[in-house]
Amino acid sequence: VAAQWDAGELGCGELVLELRFRLSALGPGELFRLVALDPGAPADIPAWCRMTGHTLVTTEHPVYLIQRKED
């Protein structure tokens, strides 16, 4: 895992904006560990990954492992 972030109970709107910024700092293919307690995260994080092209490697709410997309 190249980086991780505990987003706590941050709402998904703010969460995905910050997540986008944090993933942009990683190299292609690197892994990011996210902890998100927001009740909408189990639906929102997978949907965001599909829309942005990042790969959701594992999900066990509240922990999500995301692989940054290739450029």
Pin down the residues of each PLM region:
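Domain-level signature for proteins that mediate thiol-based redox and metal-cofactor handling
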Residues: 1-71
